[in-house]
Amino acid sequence: MAESFKEHLQEAFEDLGADNLRKFKSKLGDRRQEPRVTKSAIEKLKDEIDLADLMVGVFTSKDAVSVTVEILRAIKCNAVADDLLRNTGQSESKGALSDESKCASSKAVSKVAFSKVNFIDEHWKELIDRVNNVDPILDILRQKKVITNEDYCTIRNKETPQKKMRELLTGPITCAGNKGKEVLYDALRESNKFLMDDLEDAE
């Protein structure tokens, strides 16, 4: 049954055409409800098969259909949404996730958090060597209370970006543990998108 849902999703995405598929991906990346799909994950999609795999992987099969229909309605692709509902035998969702999906959502969120921590651990040296603009990262970390005002001033006073990153990673981030690394990852992606994409593509 899961495979059948995936096939129907793939067919729906193929029916959208290039322009509407681009709109769908944009809306999916902007979606705020959990579980969320990261824009970096969307950027790595090669075709409609990858998108169907992503939807079923992040959500359960039935909820992948509900979320897809929700986004199709938002981008005015109502005919495709109606066909998908009819082909899968689903009724219009009111936005509530099933218990099965909530469990899967929790696991998905945990997996994303783990991958962020792993990224920081694995790219420690590259981050020290290649992050050139550290101050915006410090601003975010201070706002999120990962570092103190004293940490902020101490690190900003370091002479080079490399010294700033080394002090940040070996000091406050190590003390903050996994939660600190998750926030650092998000701050790096916000302020150093191309570097982060390059490091992730190299994995």
From Swiss-Prot:
Keyword Acetylation present in the record's keywords: the answer is no
Provide the transmembrane region boundaries: none
Q: What result is annotated for mutating Q10A?
A: Impairs inflammasome activity, but does not impair speck formation
- Entries under SMART domains matching the protein: PYRIN
Start and end residues of each Pyrin domain: 1-91
Q: Where is the CARD domain?
A: 112-203
Gene3D superfamilies linked:
Death Domain, Fas
Q: What is its main location?
A: cytoplasm
Tell me the compartments it is located in: Cytoplasm; Inflammasome
The UniProt-reported impact of E14R is: Defective speck formation and impairs inflammasome activity
Q: Name one Pfam family in it.
A: PYRIN
Q: Which UniProt keywords apply?
A: Apoptosis, Cytoplasm, Immunity, Inflammasome, Inflammatory response, Innate immunity, Tumor suppressor
Q: What induces it?
A: Up-regulated in response to infection with the bacteria E.tarda.
PROSITE patterns reported in the protein's UniProt record: CARD, DAPIN
Which GO biological process annotations does it have?
Answer: activation of innate immune response; defense response to bacterium; inflammatory response; innate immune response; intrinsic apoptotic signaling pathway; pattern recognition receptor signaling pathway; positive regulation of inflammatory response; positive regulation of interleukin-1 beta production
What follows loss of this gene? Morpholino knockdown in one-cell embryos results in reduced caspa activity and impairs caspa activity in response to infection with the bacterium S.typhimurium. In addition, there is increased susceptibility to the bacterium S.typhimurium. According to PubMed:36112693 knockout animals are viable until adulthood and are indistinguishable from wild-type in appearance.
Query: What does this protein do, in the record's words?
Result: Functions as a key mediator in apoptosis and inflammation. Promotes caspase-mediated apoptosis. Induces proteolytic processing of caspa and caspa-dependent apoptosis. Involved in innate immune response by acting as an integral adapter in the assembly of various inflammasomes which recruit and activate caspase-1 leading to processing and secretion of pro-inflammatory cytokines. Caspase-1-dependent inflammation leads to macrophage pyroptosis, a form of cell death.
Tell me the domain comment: The pyrin domain mediates homotypic interactions with pyrin domain of other proteins.
The subunit structure is:
Self-associates (via pyrin and CARD domains). Interacts (via pyrin domain) with caspa (via pyrin domain). Interacts with caspb; the interaction only occurs in the presence of nlrp1. Component of NLRP1 inflammasomes. Inflammasomes are supramolecular complexes that assemble in the cytosol in response to pathogens and other damage-associated signals and play critical roles in innate immunity and inflammation. The NLRP1 inflammasome is composed of the signal sensor nlrp1, and the adapter pycard (asc), which recruit effector pro-inflammatory caspases caspa and/or caspb.
The protein here is known as Apoptosis-associated speck-like protein containing a CARD
Annotated source species: Danio rerio (Zebrafish)
> What's the gene?
pycard
